[in-house]
Swiss-Prot record:
It catalyses: D-erythro-1-(imidazol-4-yl)glycerol 3-phosphate = 3-(imidazol-4-yl)-2-oxopropyl phosphate + H2O. Belongs to the imidazoleglycerol-phosphate dehydratase family. Signal peptide: none annotated. One of its GO terms (cellular component) is cytoplasm. It comes from the Bacteria. The keyword Cytoplasm applies. InterPro entries: IGPD_sf, ImidazoleglycerolP_deHydtase, ImidazoleglycerP_deHydtase_CS, Ribosomal_Su5_D2-typ_SF. It is found in: Cytoplasm. The gene is hisB. This is Imidazoleglycerol-phosphate dehydratase. Pfam families: IGPD.
Length: 195
C-alpha cells in the first residue's frame, strides 16, 4: 500500500481532471467540479472517509454533467487502485449503515482487487436541483471498476432524494475507512497470499 500523496491528471475532449489523494489523511477536501451538488457529496465523502482529496474538474457541463461525474469516478478509482494494491496490513472488509433523517443506506465493500458493483438505490426524483440522480450509480460504477473493489450500496428506506444520495456517499466513506483500518496481525488479508 502507498500512503504518500498520489496525483493523477486525465485530459479528454470532454473533461480535464487533476486529482490528489492521500488514503490516510484527516478528511481535508478541496473539491471543484463545477457541479455544486456533486462537490457537496464529494466533500461529505472525504470528511467521513478521512481521506485527503483534492479535485479540479473542468468538463462539458453545457452538454450535461455525465462526463464530469463519471470521469471523476474513473480518476478516483485509479488513484485508489494505485494506493491500495498490493493490499497488506489492513482489515480489507468494511461495512456501514448511515442514516440521514428518514433515509437509510447500507454499504458493504471488499478491497478485493476484483471490480464489482451492486447498486440498489431507488431515488424518488430524477433530479436534485440540476443534478441527474442516475449519475450517482455511474459515479460508483466508475469508482468500483477502476479501483478494483467489490462494492454493494443498498437503500434501506428514504423519500428525500438529497438525503438518500448523501447517505449513500457517507456510507461508502465510513465503510472504506473501516476497510482501511490498519491491523498488523493480518499481513496479506487473503488465503491466496496476494491481492
Amino acid at each position: 500500500m502507498r500512503e504518500e500523496i498520489l496525483e493523477l491528471t486525465r485530459n479528454t475532449k470532454e473533461t480535464q481532471i487533476s486529482m490528489k489523494l492521500k488514503i490516510y489523511g484527516s478528511g481535508v477536501a478541496k473539491i471543484s467540479t463545477g457541479i455544486g451538488f456533486f462537490d457537496h457529496m464529494l466533500e461529505a465523502f472525504t470528511k467521513h472517509s478521512l481521506l485527503d482529496l483534492e479535485i479540479s474538474c473542468k468538463g462539458d457541463t453545457h452538454v450535461d454533467f455525465h462526463h464530469s461525474v463519471e470521469d471523476v469516478g474513473i480518476v478516483l478509482g485509479q488513484l485508489l487502485n494505485e494506493a491500495l494494491y498490493p493490499l497488506s496490513g489492513v482489515e480489507r472488509f468494511g461495512e456501514a449503515s448511515v442514516v440521514m433523517d428518514e433515509a437509510a443506506v447500507f454499504c458493504a465493500l471488499d478491497l478485493s482487487n476484483r471490480a464489482y458493483l451492486v447498486y440498489e438505490n431507488f431515488n424518488e426524483n430524477a433530479k436534485v436541483g440540476e443534478f441527474d440522480t442516475e449519475l450517482v450509480e455511474e459515479f460508483f460504477r466508475a469508482v468500483a471498476i477502476n479501483s478494483a473493489i467489490t462494492l454493494h450500496l443498498n437503500q434501506i428506506r428514504g423519500k428525500n432524494t438529497h438525503h438518500i444520495i448523501e447517505a449513500t456517499f457517507k456510507s461508502f466513506a465510513v465503510a472504506l475507512r473501516r476497510a482501511l483500518a490498519k491491523n498488523a496481525r493480518i499481513g496479506t488479508p487473503s488465503t491466496k497470499g496476494v491481492l
